[in-house]
């Protein structure tokens, strides 16, 4: 499954994995998964977190290692119900629910994920996605960026 990923995607997922793997031991625990999900405004129960881990925990050790994480991401990318996932992701970024992601909202979510970005980097991310040039990202622009990955 993970064989279909490009080197660039694998590098991106490695970076995402390290955001989850707070103590850097190469495994994501339910506690670490919960921390990241809560920073994104989600509030999963302990049982839901365990289910998420069990879903991809191939060796049954109760944690997710990087190869298991890659398989999960490869599966998610193939998933046909990605429309709903994109809407959900957009809602996470669009804090005030006005239908647009502003630079401030993007910075807020990225900071919660542990990404320390300069104002220039945030502005650059907005510019890359902002097709109509209004300084913020609407849903269509967001989908284009996410699908291009």
Swiss-Prot record:
Binding site for Ca(2+) 1: 21, 23, 25, 27, 32
Chain ranges of the EF-hand domain: 8-43, 44-79, 81-116, 117-149
GO molecular function: calcium ion binding; enzyme regulator activity
InterPro entries in the cross-refs: CALM/Myosin/TropC-like, EF-hand-dom_pair, EF_Hand_1_Ca_BS, EF_hand_dom
SUPFAM superfamilies in the cross-refs: EF-hand
Record note on modification: The N-terminus is blocked.
Gene3D superfamilies: EF-hand
General remark: This protein has four functional calcium-binding sites.
Function per UniProt: Calmodulin mediates the control of a large number of enzymes, ion channels and other proteins by Ca(2+). Among the enzymes to be stimulated by the calmodulin-Ca(2+) complex are a number of protein kinases and phosphatases.
Protein's name according to its UniProt entry: Calmodulin
Species: Spinacia oleracea (Spinach)
Lineage of origin: Eukaryota, Viridiplantae, Streptophyta, Embryophyta, Tracheophyta
